[in-house]
Amino acid sequence: TGEHHVFHADIYLKDEQELDLAGFHIRVLHTPGHTPGGCCYYFPYENVVFSGDTLFCTSVGRTDFPGGSMSDIIRSIKEKLMTLPDRTTVYPGHNDVTTIENERMYNPYL
């Protein structure tokens, strides 16, 4: 009985696309696995990545949703996130903040 709204994108982001937004330089990292269209956002000047539901502190995102894939999420993390500098701070969508170095050393999925 409730009204619903359908939203349409004004722009579509692409892997490795660079954006300047609100004084920040951001690189889009397409990281499928949790969902086919999953992305992380890397701020190189701040040395920060927002990993959403891709990478968590000593864990990874769920892949049991339609379109999710454990092999894709591991590949995404290894190819896109583990190539970032060790001191990069990772802000996941849930739980504790971590670093790329910490995940390289202690994440059992990697």
Language-model features and meaning:
Residues 3-7, 18, 25-30, 35-110:
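Metallo-beta-lactamase
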Residues 11-14:
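Short acidic-hydrophobic, aromatic-tinged amphipathic segments that line or gate anion-handling sites
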